Amino acid sequence: MSATLASPLRALLRLGLIPQIVIGIALGVGVAIVWPDAATSVALLGQVFISALKAVAPILVFLLVMTAIANHRRGQPTHIRGVLLLYVVGTLCAALVAVLASFIFPTSLVIDAPQASGEPPGGIAEILRNLLLNVVDNPVNALLNANFVGILAWAMGLGMMLRGASETTLVVLNAFSDAVSSIVQLVIRCAPLGIFGLVAGTLADTGLNALLDYAHLLAVIVGCMLFVALVTNPLIVFLATRRNPYPLVFACLRGSAITAFFTRSSAANIPVNMELCKRLDLHPDTYSISIPLGATINMAGAAVTISVITLAATHTLGIGVDFATALLLCVVASLAACGVSGVAGGSLLLIPMAASLFGISPDVAMQVVAIGFVISVVQDATETALNSSTDVLFTAAACRARR
C-alpha cells in the first residue's frame, strides 16, 4: 500500500514548481467548495509560507546587495540607471492606460459604504518625507521592520566601504550570502503547499459574492492591469531590447506573478524574484539592487488602482475631468504609487490624496476607499502580481538592452 502511495508522490515531486503550484491552486479551490471548515484550518499553511518569505527577505536583500557591491570591480557592467528609467516609464504608462480606460468605460459607484479605517497621507510631500526618513533608518530597525529602502541604503554603504577589504572577508561575505540563498530555495520549494493554504483559506473566508456588487469596477481595474502586463510592458521591453518580448514576459508572469498573486506582498516575493533573475542569468550586481528597489518604488498596479477608483468617484459625483487634469492625475498617481510600500493599506489609502485634485471631500473619498477594500481580495492580488513581475521584466530588459 505504501509503495502504491509513494509512486504518485514521487511523480508529483518530479514535476516542476509551476505545475505543482497549479495543482495546489486546484486543490485549494476544491477543498474550499467541498469542505469549507477544513479550508479554514489549512489556511495556516499559507500564513506560515508568507511569514517565512517575509522573514528571509530582509536579510537576503541586505547580504546580497552588500556582497554584490563589495565584490564589484571597476569596469564590470551594471544597468541600474536603465532599470530605474524603465520603472518610471512603466508606472506612468500604467497610469495613462487606467485614465484612458476610465474614460472609455466609466464606472458609477453606490457611495453608501461604511467609513474605511486608516489615516491617509497628507500629500506627496509627506510621502517623499517618509521615504527620506526610511533611508536614514537605524539598520537594525530597518531589518526588523522590513524597511527595504533603509536596508538598501545600509547595504550599499557597507558594500562600498568593504570594497577594499581582504580576500578572506569577501569569502566570508559570499559564504553567508550563499547560505541565505539556500534557505530561500528551501522556502520557495514549499510554495505549492503555501498557495494551497492561501487559496483554500481566502475562498472559505470571503467567497465571491462580495465581489459581484462591484463587478464593473473590478473588471476595469483587472482589465487595465492585464493590458499593461500583456501589451504596454511588452511594448516597452521591445523598444528597449529590439527583440520579441513575449518569451521574457511569459517567463516573468509564470515565475513571479503567480506566487505574488497569492502572497499579495511584493516584499514576500523578493526571494522568488531573486531566484528567477538567477535562472534568467541576469547580472547579480544589477538584480540584487533593482529587485528590492522595485518592490518599493515600481508600482504600476498601484497607479492603475489609484487612477481608476479616483475617476470612478468623479464620474459618480458628476465632476467633469478635462484632459489636462487627467494627465496631472497620471503624474500624481505615479508619484503616489512610489510611496505605496510606506503606507499602511497600500494604494487604497492614497486615493483621498488623488481625489483632492477634483475637490472631493475626505469623507466621500474614504467611502470610496471602503469600496476598494471590498474588492481588495482580487484587486490587491492582481496589483501585486503586476508590480512584482514587472520588477523582473524591466531588470531583464535593462540587462539585455541594445546600446
Curated annotation (Swiss-Prot):
It catalyses: L-serine(in) + Na(+)(in) = L-serine(out) + Na(+)(out); L-threonine(in) + Na(+)(in) = L-threonine(out) + Na(+)(out). SUPFAM superfamilies: Proton glutamate symport protein. It holds the Pfam family SDF. The keyword Endoplasmic reticulum does not apply. It is found in: Cell inner membrane. Keywords: Amino-acid transport, Cell inner membrane, Cell membrane, Membrane, Symport, Transmembrane, Transmembrane helix, Transport. It is a multi-pass membrane protein. InterPro entries: Na-dicarboxylate_symporter, Na:dicarbo_symporter_sf, Ser_Thr_transp_SstT. One of its GO terms (cellular component) is plasma membrane. The chain crosses the membrane at residues 15-35, 49-69, 85-105, 142-162, 183-203, 218-238, 246-268, 289-309, 317-337, 362-382. One of its GO terms (molecular function) is neutral L-amino acid:sodium symporter activity. One of its GO terms (biological process) is serine transport. Coiled coil: none annotated. Gene3D superfamilies: Sodium:dicarboxylate symporter. Belongs to the dicarboxylate/amino acid:cation symporter (DAACS) (TC 2.A.23) family. PANTHER family: PROTON/GLUTAMATE-ASPARTATE SYMPORTER (PTHR42865), SERINE_THREONINE TRANSPORTER SSTT (PTHR42865:SF8). Involved in the import of serine and threonine into the cell, with the concomitant import of sodium (symport system). NCBIfam families: PRK13628.1. This is Serine/threonine transporter SstT. It comes from Chromohalobacter salexigens (strain ATCC BAA-138 / DSM 3043 / CIP 106854 / NCIMB 13768 / 1H11). The lineage of its organism: Bacteria, Pseudomonadati, Pseudomonadota, Gammaproteobacteria, Oceanospirillales. The gene is sstT.
